[in-house]
Amino acid sequence: MARECLSKGFDLIDWYELDPEVVKDCQKHLPKICGEVKANNNVKTYWGDAFESIKKVKDSKYDKIFVDLNDDQFCIDLAAKNMKSLKRILKPGGVITAQVGCLSKKPKQIKNWMELLESNFGNVELTEAFIPSFDCRWNFGSSSHK
């Protein structure tokens, strides 16, 4: 995710990551993909539970928030429980985007994500992209904070 943000010209990225081992393995086995992120001083990594970490973040700090949880119901419930904190740190006019899974494989989960975003922000848009490593079209739900 950080690599894609850098490729789109983001000036500063705060990356909240639970598992340092996953990142180390990605850097080791996928150096072409991860090398740019590792070498970039515009990416600040916060280790640990993201939802705990954002409790300390000042209000309206972020223009964009990307939520990259698994697409199972537990993670949707976890996001729902923490949506107030996510809204608090998103600037007015900012956009929150969540990877919501594959519509053809898990339509109920996508519906639940979309309802969660709609109920909290009053708007939601579903987009998709082909992810080669997932071998399917992957969906993303986005809402703007008005």
Regions found by a protein language model. Give the residues of each.
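Core SAM-dependent methyltransferase catalytic element
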Residues: N120-G122, P132-K146
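Acidic carboxylate-rich catalytic motifs and surrounding loops in phosphoryl-/glycosyl-chemistry enzymes
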Residues: G101-C102, E128-P132
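The AdoMet/dcAdoMet-binding core of the Class I SAM-like
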Residues: M1-M114, E118-N120, C136
